[in-house]
Amino acid sequence: MTNIRKSHPLLKIINHSFIDLPTPSNISTWWNFGSLLGACLIIQILTGLFLAMHYTAYTTTAFSSVAHICRDVNYGWLIRYLHANGASMFFICLYLHVGRGLYYGSYMFTETWNIGILLLFTVMATAFMGYVLPWGQMSFWGATVITNLLSAIPYIGTTLVEWIWGGFSVDKATLTRFFAFHFSLPFIITALVLVHLLFLHETGSNNPSGIDSNSDKIPFHPYYTIKDILGLLLMLTALLILVLFSPDLLGDPDNYTPANPLNTPPHIKPEWYFLFAYAILRSIPNKLGGVLALIFSILILAIIPLLHTSKQRSMLFRPFSQCLFWILAANLLILTWIGGQPVEHPYITIGQLASISYFSILLIIMPLTSIMENKLLKWRVLVV
């Protein structure tokens, strides 16, 4: 008799995706982040669902409803902080997942990569709208500043901003629609994740060497299920330490003050995971130029496959490209730091230099370095 997991219409799909899936035998811990992102998404949807049961999307009660969740709801404080810090964990895994894709050349699976970029944009939009919901000072002013950027679009900008606001300022209508979108977008993200996996399983996983591994595959279960469970336990440990010992570490103190349209905070900034893009936005004096740079700082990932000039897929055997990759990583950390600093000297200059470095490394220096490595490899072969 055939095993039910191989014959049942539904179980067969799960079997081909998570049990009998042929997987390269040499994939490292950097390949764990896909499953961790799935776990983060489940945590966010479940905690978000319970928060939505007690939250009220109305300007006069939103702030107090969040306080009510933390004070009066059983384990409400735990659910709220798991959701807030779960978002931070989500973005840590997301950025490491993208970084692994860049390092090992996973972007050569263009369909999977492009769906991944779409997922990144959707998750960022969801997180931004979620940050507005507690209706604290930083929620209100963050929403005002970021949505106001759309007014830089020629001709239709102002009308578009007022359409998104549902009035002439961020108010009741804005909060209601942001809650509606924040609630519904995770389900769209889940659908996109399934499409992402569908395209990935068409080609099979990449591996650290970047070469074809069809001759050396092992089943996903039990080898990688055990490995993923270990990664999940480590991530949950880190998340629980953050939630139980310093839940407000990554938040902004201003958000514990109810939103006041008449009082502007001294320094408006988004959550830490958007600071690198915010620093790029602020480094350009022109409003439209800043908005375009902000969008392109993420959209640049879409043209990475076109800029791949190396004869090798992975950076594993390309020391110069490796150096550039880690310089880029350090540069992003500098941009994140600058995004959280006030707009004054020397932070403005550092931000501008880091922004120029970010784009020039990805667009110019990396492709040229790859060409140079091809030449060096050719010369080495000739010498031998």
Swiss-Prot record:
Pfam families attached here?
Cytochrom_B_C (PF00032), Cytochrome_B (PF00033)
Q: Which residues cross the membrane?
A: 33-53, 77-98, 113-133, 178-198, 226-246, 288-308, 320-340, 347-367
Miscellaneous notes for this chain? Heme 1 (or BL or b562) is low-potential and absorbs at about 562 nm, and heme 2 (or BH or b566) is high-potential and absorbs at about 566 nm.
Q: Which Gene3D superfamilies would you find in this protein's record? A: Cytochrome Bc1 Complex, Chain C
What cofactor does this chain's UniProt record say it requires?
heme b
Organism lineage string = Eukaryota, Metazoa, Chordata, Craniata, Vertebrata
Where does the UniProt entry say this protein principally localizes?
A: mitochondrion
InterPro entries noted in UniProt = Cyt_b/b6_C, Cyt_b/b6_C_sf, Cyt_b/b6_N, Cytb/b6-like_sf, Cytochrome_b, Cytochrome_b_C_euk/bac, Cytochrome_b_N_euk/bac, Di-haem_cyt_TM
Annotated source species: Hystrix africaeaustralis
Q: Name one GO molecular function term.
A: metal ion binding
Residues holding heme b b566: 97, 196
Q: How does it sit in the membrane?
A: Multi-pass membrane protein
Record's cofactor remark: Binds 2 heme b groups non-covalently.
Its biological purpose is as follows: Component of the ubiquinol-cytochrome c reductase complex (complex III or cytochrome b-c1 complex) that is part of the mitochondrial respiratory chain. The b-c1 complex mediates electron transfer from ubiquinol to cytochrome c. Contributes to the generation of a proton gradient across the mitochondrial membrane that is then used for ATP synthesis.
Compartment(s): Mitochondrion inner membrane
Q: Where does a ubiquinone bind?
A: 201
One of its GO biological process terms is:
mitochondrial electron transport, ubiquinol to cytochrome c
Q: What is this protein called?
A: Cytochrome b
Q: What family is this protein classified in?
A: Belongs to the cytochrome b family.
